[in-house]
Amino acid sequence: MQFVRTVKKTPVTLLALSIGLALQAQAFSVLAQDADEPQTEQAAQAAQASSNDSGSLGTVTVTGYRASLEKAVDIKRSEAGIVDAIVAEDIADFPDLNLAESLQRIPGVSITREGGEGRNISVRGLGPQFTRVRINGMETISTTGGTDTSGGVNRGRGFDFNTFASELFSQLVVRKTSSADVPEGSLGATVDLRTARPFDFDGFTLAIGGQLGYSDLASETNPRGTFLISNTFADNKLGALLSVAYTDRTVLEEGSDTVRWSAASANGGFSPASTFAVPGTAYHPRIPRYNRYLHEQERLGVTASVQFRPSARTELVFDGLFSRFDANRWQDNINAVAFSASGATGKPGIIVRDGEVDSTGSLVYGVFDNVRIRSEGRYDEQTSEFDQWSWSLRHDFSDALRLNAFVGSAKSVYDNPVQTTVIADKLGVNGYSYDYRGDRRLPTLSYGNMNPSDPSGWTLAEIRLRPYKVTNEFDNVTLDLAWTASPYFTLKGGADYKDFDYQVQNWGRGTPGGNRVETVPAGLVSSAELAQLMRQYNISAGGAGTAVVPDVAAFARALGIHDGSGIFTVHSNLNNLAADNRQVNEEVKGYFVQGDFNFDVGSILVRGNVGVRRVETTLTSDGWSIIGGVPVATRVVNEYSDTLPSFNLAAEISPDVVLRLAAAEVMTRPDLGFLNPGASVSVAGSARTVTTGNPRLDPFRAKTLDLGVEWYFGDGGILSFGAFYKDIDSYIQTSRETRPYSTSGLPESLIAGTGATVNDEFTFQQPLNTPGGKLKGYEIAYQQPFTFLPGFWRDFGVQLNYTWVDSDIQYLSSTGAPTAKGPMIGLSKNAWNATLYYDNQKFSARVSAAHRSDYANQIPGRESTDMEGTAATTTVDASLSYNFNERFSISLEGLNLTDEWNDMWIDSGRDLPIAYTHTGRQYMLGFRYKF
């Protein structure tokens, strides 16, 4: 089946597409870079209607891949606000591993990866917590886990896109400006994801697709499959659809890490018997090591949809979505843990025999005696399960009055029932050395008189059991009316209600009423028995070679560590664990009124909207505070409200040029990790400290301004420029400050029995509202098919976009004092995407590159550094497809062809490595068939 573009003879066109398996893979990959989609279902219906009515209109027919690009251009032109989109009409034709991989093609969107695939997005320099995601019109959160260096479990408001198979979705919309009829919560963007529906297709549709993937680093093959069946009944008044997507994936990730760098004077300093003097201010790696992660992932997604349209005036839609993402992970490493520890087996016992301190004051080379070496084996079983259902109703009482109603519920559960780490130590190793001089990212590690592949001589040190669970639940109800007062003005108004629950639970070994315990009794296993419970692993990165690590599965069988009995019983109410167990409920009531306008001023067509949204939030946060070593239940209730005006205007000053202006006041609620009411109180003599979350935080609040100009030329060509500015009035940071307890808002019961009073001064470490700062930037996008060239060359085309963002945020030091301004966390100053494609009716090819510059992960950094960050990345993907006929096609795709490494660092002056890992290249050979 071919793409068909039907151009009505009107000033602004909505093009109709019929997207088939033969070409859609190519269409999606480029649409993702610079496409826009109407924000309303009515716009999508209008596009479908234009296709159905094309026989009665004067038309110009364009087939193939270019039709999809021209549709994207027309949609961008017709919108009042600033949006970009990816549109599909068949499940089997989504080319990227997941949704984040496709969204990164859109101007201003950058991604972070986990296990070699996209996990989170940032929009215009604003991180995942500033972007709201809706699925089929309903706000939701999806949560997965990750390695410790990549941030671990998502405990915040950010959306993890790797939960879902990309083939489940037919439309992705990134809305960069605000309007009153779109619920609040975003400083960056609102992303709408829509699954396929039966009326998207013409009658009976059955499509299947399959791929066989290969990961070159893991040397593993991985299957991937899709299935869709859809039909309409009762003279096209009723439709039903079912789709299924499945992926099995094995990825190997390996490289070096340091768990940060610290000063030589920390943890008691090196042994005074050292023969090489290390300055106390010199920085050294805390835990130098090579890591190996084996990710085994299985992803299943199912969507179901029923549409009932008894007349042109009424439509009822049911959407259901289920997804399960199983991600089991093995982590193996051998390391010099002594550099991060105190005591006789820690740094004070290490004798420095030789070393080199470079010009940045870093101990980049050293030879050491009496070093404690650690071998760690960790295994995680992780499941992210998501289910959602919703009903939506549209009814036109007349040509002038429309009702829209929506009710839905969604639940996301991340469950990590097995997080087990088995640790063995070997003491007194002499001649250990590390060398970062030749390669600062892939050092040379030598273990002196110890053979790292010898299983004998180890001592069992710890068995860590840390199950974890995060649950997010949303219930939504919305109702709104739209009255078309004239051809030039429509008045909208409505109300919505949202109930959101968030819960974190974690467990550990120990006795209720006591603390978490991770050590094991001496003699639990003998040295000989331990040797039988070790296994070998190999790391190719940096020539690390072979070493032994505790075999978690063997330990589980031998000791019953997962049986939940004896010393391996886990509890959630341990004194040093309970404060991290928490629950948050948000009850949100919203109201809006908005006017949509569309009129001519002389020869200029002016359209847009102006409105205001009022939102009232009631927050109830429950947790545990540790008082005198005993967990005490704590509850904090907070209420706040916001009035958010918005304005969007598009002026067509000529047939080919559109000017845009948008302004709004916006807000993002505090990240969920900040809202823990739990507090740990310590009173020791005159030292009084409180460590706590802060449920009384105000939201992030900002004023935004957008300006843009777009020039449309040729067949589907566009050159656009957009500038944006955000004045962030209220920001949130964690700080330390000293003030009376009475000013904290915490209950007096927390300090009962400590001897302190509410008038005493305490040192508080908690999140606080801070002044914020400014964010500004611009986007440039260029798209053009080369139809003006002769012969073979006319089938080529290009898409390019570039985004520049800058920010000045006032940060606080670890003592609460203001420091110099710095960039916003997660902000890449420069980002660009480029795609060169070739497309005709038989053959399609593309190569795409996505770049983001370095960005900060934490300001100030740990270990008394200025910041921590991630280095720039540039990923390159390519694909080929061949259409045998309108039903059957084959494809070949290559992802991360340059094998880009993930490079995290600490201290901007020293540029010291934290983690440096890669996952290799991936190739996929696939087919698509439509019956």
Which residues does each predicted region cover?
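Gram-negative outer-membrane beta-barrel transporters
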Residues: 725-727, 744-859, 898
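Short loop/turn motifs that connect adjacent beta-strands in outer-membrane beta-barrel proteins
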Residues: 164, 182-183, 198-204, 234-238, ...
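N-terminal periplasmic "start-of-domain" segments of outer-membrane beta-barrel proteins
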Residues: 59-94, 120, 143, 147-152
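Structural signature of Gram-negative outer-membrane beta-barrels, strongest in the C-terminal barrel
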Residues: 307-311, 319, 396-400, 408-410, ...
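C-terminal beta-signal and adjacent terminal beta-strands/loops
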Residues: 727-729, 850-860, 881-931
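Outer-membrane beta-barrel signature, preferentially recognizing the C-terminal barrel domain
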Residues: 378, 384-386, 580-586, 667-728, ...
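Extracytoplasmic beta-strand/coil segments of soluble accessory domains associated
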Residues: 100-147, 176
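Outer-membrane beta-barrel translocator/receptor signature
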Residues: 151-159, 167-174, 181-275, 286, ...
